[in-house]
């Protein structure tokens, strides 16, 4: 039956749909960065910072969203420590590093731990830097719930 031999067979290089998807991806990658961002990216490369354009775009977007640069740095540091951990498990100092970042993201969003952790860290650091936060008064200076200074705290009846 000659009809079965028509079309791309298992020996062909790539199906036409896959090739079209590759071309779309290549076009999208070319337009990832704006002209200003491309200049920054080229400066980072000239300074010796080898980074993927997609990752660079994410970093620029985070900074545009007013995420604290320190939070972005700490997120990248923990992600890089995780990559080193996966490739070089014999380093004991690197093993203890990622465990310190786990409690920071535990009670937060259950979605992306890396991005959620960075946003939670940025949110926390922006709150800590706020001058509107007032220190709490120590509880020793407060009066007991029983009322005035003459009354004693509640006692059990005998």
UniProtKB/Swiss-Prot annotation:
Compositionally biased intervals (Low complexity): 111-122
- Annotated localization: Cytoplasm, Cytoskeleton, Microtubule organizing center, Centrosome; Cytoplasm, Cytoskeleton, Spindle
Q: Which UniProt keywords apply?
A: Cytoplasm, Cytoskeleton, Phosphoprotein
One Gene Ontology CC term in the entry: centrosome
Cystine residue pairs: none
Q: Which residues carry this modification: Phosphoserine?
A: 34, 152
Show the ranges annotated as biased composition (Polar residues): 128-140
Coiled-coil intervals: none
Q: Which domain of life is it from?
A: Eukaryota
Q: Map out region (Disordered) in residue numbers.
A: 84-158
Database matches in PANTHER family: MITOTIC-SPINDLE ORGANIZING PROTEIN 2, MITOTIC-SPINDLE ORGANIZING PROTEIN 2A-RELATED
The task this protein performs is described as:
Required for the recruitment and the assembly of the gamma-tubulin ring complex (gTuRC) at the centrosome. The gTuRC regulates the minus-end nucleation of alpha-beta tubulin heterodimers that grow into microtubule protafilaments, a critical step in centrosome duplication and spindle formation.
Per UniProt, subunit arrangement is: Associates with the gamma-tubulin ring complex (gTuRC) consisting of TUBGCP2, TUBGCP3, TUBGCP4, TUBGCP5 and TUBGCP6 and gamma-tubulin TUBG1 or TUBG2; within the complex, interacts with TUBGCP2; the interaction plays a role in gTuRC activation. Interacts with TUBG1.
Q: Which family does it belong to?
A: Belongs to the MOZART2 family.
What is this protein identified as?
A: Mitotic-spindle organizing protein 2B
């Amino acid at each position: 039956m000659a009809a079965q031999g028509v079309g791309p067979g298992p020996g062909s290089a790539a199906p036409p749909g896959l090739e079209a998807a590759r071309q779309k991806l290549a076009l999208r990658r070319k337009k990832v960065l704006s002209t200003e961002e491309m200049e920054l990216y080229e400066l980072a490369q000239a300074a010796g910072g080898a980074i993927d354009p997609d990752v660079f775009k994410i970093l620029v977007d985070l900074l545009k969203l007013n995420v604290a640069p320190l939070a972005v740095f700490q997120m990248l540091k923990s992600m890089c420590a995780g990559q080193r951990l996966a490739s070089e498990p014999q380093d004991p100092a690197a093993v203890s590093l990622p465990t310190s970042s786990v409690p920071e993201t535990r009670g937060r969003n259950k979605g992306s731990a890396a991005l959620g952790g960075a946003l939670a860290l940025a949110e926390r650091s922006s709150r800590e830097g706020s001058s509107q936060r007032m220190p709490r008064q120590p509880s020793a200076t407060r009066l007991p719930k029983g009322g005035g200074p003459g009354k004693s705290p509640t006692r059990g009846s005998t």
